[in-house]
Amino acid sequence: MACKCDCKNKQCKCGDKCECSGDKCCEKYCCEEASEKKCCPAGCKGDCKCANCHCAEQKQCGDKTHQHQGTAAAH
């Protein structure tokens, strides 16, 4: 039960570890809900949400992504 990172804040208040998936997430976007445990990669524009993790006009984010382009390289 360490500190929690905010999705809107790319800088984690706690400079230790995130409850998401490693400190890497902390630096980028971490879900404030441990139940979701999801993180947005740096491929997002910056206004990504952890709950849905969907990018406005950028590459796939993670979970829900609008496949507007013809790229189907989803893990």
Curated annotation (Swiss-Prot):
Nucleotidyltransferase listed as a keyword: no
Induction comment: By cadmium.
GO molecular function, a single term: cadmium ion binding
Top-level taxonomic group: Eukaryota
Family: Belongs to the metallothionein superfamily. Type 6 family.
Domain free text: All cysteine residues are arranged in C-X-C groups. These are thought to be the metal-binding sites in other metallothioneins.
Protein name according to UniProt: Metallothionein-1
Organism (species): Caenorhabditis elegans
Organism lineage string: Eukaryota, Metazoa, Ecdysozoa, Nematoda, Chromadorea
Primary gene name: mtl-1
